[in-house]
């Protein structure tokens, strides 16, 4: 018989550096999950990724306080910033542009995120990420 699901917890945790401090500790502590067990498992799963990369994670908590978790791909905004070599997006994206990015690079990001995105095809996902790039103040070339 399958375990009864008690809750889903969605967090964004930096790869390789999950620890019991907020936001991880309070979110898991409220549901009675073993926080250190999650931190060790998450850090082990993300050790090969770039250190400090924000990783969305969905934790499924069961009624017996056990858990499973699924990691997603990093946010498109993070991938765009690293591809363009920026620290942050533009505070005024319509008037103040902060950099440029090639359409080929955006398509590469769309293909990487294809598993987590909802879209008809890679072209539709590419257009979605182009919109994110423009809203960050990036100029799309090509």
UniProtKB/Swiss-Prot annotation:
One of its GO terms (cellular component) is cytosolic large ribosomal subunit. One of its GO terms (molecular function) is large ribosomal subunit rRNA binding. SMART domains: RL11. Signal peptide: none annotated. One or more lysine residues are methylated. It holds the Pfam family Ribosomal_L11_N. The keyword Nucleotide-binding does not apply. Keywords: Methylation, Ribonucleoprotein, Ribosomal protein, RNA-binding, rRNA-binding. InterPro entries: Ribosomal_uL11, Ribosomal_uL11_bac-typ, Ribosomal_uL11_C, Ribosomal_uL11_C_sf, Ribosomal_uL11_CS, Ribosomal_uL11_N, Ribosomal_uL11_N_sf. One of its GO terms (biological process) is translation. HAMAP family: Ribosomal_uL11. NCBIfam families: L11_bact. Part of the ribosomal stalk of the 50S ribosomal subunit. Interacts with L10 and the large rRNA to form the base of the stalk. L10 forms an elongated spine to which L12 dimers bind in a sequential fashion forming a multimeric L10(L12)X complex. Belongs to the universal ribosomal protein uL11 family. Forms part of the ribosomal stalk which helps the ribosome interact with GTP-bound translation factors. PANTHER family: 60S RIBOSOMAL PROTEIN L12 (PTHR11661), LARGE RIBOSOMAL SUBUNIT PROTEIN UL11M (PTHR11661:SF1). This is Large ribosomal subunit protein uL11. The lineage of its organism: Bacteria, Pseudomonadati, Pseudomonadota, Gammaproteobacteria, Alteromonadales.
